[in-house]
Amino acid sequence: MPNDLTPPALLVEGLTKSYGPRRALDNVSLTVGRGEFVALLGPNGAGKSTLFQLLSGLFGADAGRIVVAGHDLKANPTAALARFGIVFQQATLDLELTVQANLLFHAGLHGMPSALARARAAEMLEQFNLSARAKEPARALSGGTRRRLELARALMHEPTILLMDEATVGLDPASRLELLRIVREMREKRGVAVLWATHLCEEVAEADRVIVLHQGHVMKDCTPDDLITDTGKATLMEAFVSLTTERASVPA
């Protein structure tokens, strides 16, 4: 169990990133505790995808630091990235490989011994109700089932924190709710922390905390209930809109 001396699953301090004259992230700081479910809520263009690209090491930040379970991403990228399980907005499965082979390929990238990889794959297939489809190509799966496979793959190496980057985009309402339910269940069963990026208020109501991102700035970091109370609004949607309209002032 985490204690006061255990470093958080994720620590972001002063993260800044610009593309030419446009500043996509401006001095962003946030923390995700061990086993915590934190929703990153922001409209399109808020900087959510840029943040996830920096977290996953696809690009470097102009300033600031990222520490994953005590490992500085810049100083020790291998150890830091190994603590992440990531489901990107765009599907990243190899559609020609079988369901099982997608899991085993991921295990190989993380240096898992063959016997352990096969045991973990069998466990994930069972847990995500994919055992009967293990030998089918990923191409044969529906959108919702592909997302389940991507989540199973992200958990293969037992990460400290899951990064879910708009993972429900393109899913029907039933599949979207099912994916959210599974992620919450994995958090409860495995103690994995979650950073869930979304623009949909209905996906954040049960989060431990909500971080509202707008124009590259953190506008609010609090519980869903406090977000409503602090803005003086009646619903999460109204609170979100009040913080992310063009009239909303970003922090100086």
Where does each model-flagged region fall?
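Conserved ABC transporter NBD signature motif
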Residues: 64-75, 80
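Conserved ABC ATPase "signature" region
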Residues: 104, 108, 115-133
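Conserved ABC ATPase signature
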Residues: 137-141
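Conserved catalytic motifs of ABC-family nucleotide-binding domains
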Residues: 158
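Catalytic Walker B motif of ABC-type/P-loop ATPase nucleotide-binding domains
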Residues: 162-165
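Helical segment within the ABC ATPase nucleotide-binding domain
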Residues: 177-189
